[in-house]
């Protein structure tokens, strides 16, 4: 990033902050290859063109040479439209070059945002904490904050209706008109190609072929969406100490906020419209949660605010059913693979004062997290480890592997699933998942050797069992070697949140998506 920052500073001085000339530099595509994180086009095999999944500098140089040609893209697109139903060679060839260009373009537009993030962290002196990157790091926050809230809104973030909205958002950040025209060209042509080749396809087709660029545009859209939510929260916390008498006129609301921010007229009056000092916001995988300690009427105001701002700011109709508001004490919400709810635990305490004794019923709140067994079985069934009803079956595609490789694969999947779902307060679902994977492993081995699954379970009972141990269970088995099975199948009930889960396993990810 430091080297890339040096290139950017050089081009800023020469080209007056133009990003477009960077597309003609080969090192940009090298950066796209190095930092692709398995989402770059250079990692994906192009069987239709005969290329492998290695980075090809020859293709990049050929692309740069063709971009220097005048009106190359216009002539290529016209040629594709004329011959689209005659042959697909020109289409796939040009489509491949467009994907490479989109990868390089994604790297370029990320540069200003990356530099701004680095400078912001340095100014605020925020230390880099890798533990906060874990998906489990949010659950201790929920255990601490969620118990004091009354209502919860489950929000389904809508997708932008038109790609031109994304370009308009980027225009406020990047002043390079040529880069914006190139982005419009890529989005427009991909939409036309997909409508010709694969009709009735949405923006999802574009995201499959251009993961990095679409991820950047989607994150930009999410940033604008969250700004509409964070702005009233910041203003409400600030305006609680500011006179709100002049804010009763809603016509020039935001202009008056700016003037009030300078005047700082302290008063006991409060802004009643958005006042909510106990509001919390969490976003995950296209969804978000808005928790509040206020009343149901206040949550309706937030819903009204979000729906109308989506309509007027993003220019598309947003259905009110995308925001579901429930009372937290009577509501179980799905969050990152867990069904979470706030439970009231009753405990009897005996108090004695002098000669009199009496019992007191004490109620305490506790965040309960459980694994939904039906989506878990559905995910295992989709991966062909069991049937839809949860009956374990063999994995025929793995029968060509060695026995140790088969056992290691099943054990690795089981440990990763157990590692991610270790925060469940009820372990029955985990035990059933381990049973399905263990029996599926035995039946896969039996199918390979044309034997019975019972014989493999008897022959490899101890070794096969150890492969499905999780980390915490391995520690317990070392401390209590004679009581391993007892701890494995019923005694170990503590919730554990790990701070090293940076990337989610594919099977876990499919579980999160299917639910």
Swiss-Prot record:
Record-level GO BP terms: mRNA processing; RNA splicing; tRNA processing
* Alphabetized UniProt keyword annotations: Chloroplast, mRNA processing, Plastid, RNA-binding, tRNA processing
**Any one cellular-component term (Gene Ontology):** chloroplast
InterPro entries reported in the protein's UniProt record: Domain_X, Maturase_MatK, Maturase_MatK_N
Which locations, inside or outside the cell, does it occupy?
Plastid, Chloroplast
Major localization class: plastid
| Entry GO MF terms | RNA binding
Record keyword Manganese present: no
Organism's domain of life? Answer: Eukaryota
> What does this protein do, in the record's words?
Usually encoded in the trnK tRNA gene intron. Probably assists in splicing its own and other chloroplast group II introns.
* Family stated for the protein in its record: Belongs to the intron maturase 2 family. MatK subfamily.
UniProt name for this protein: Maturase K
Q: Which organism is it from?
A: Alpinia calcarata
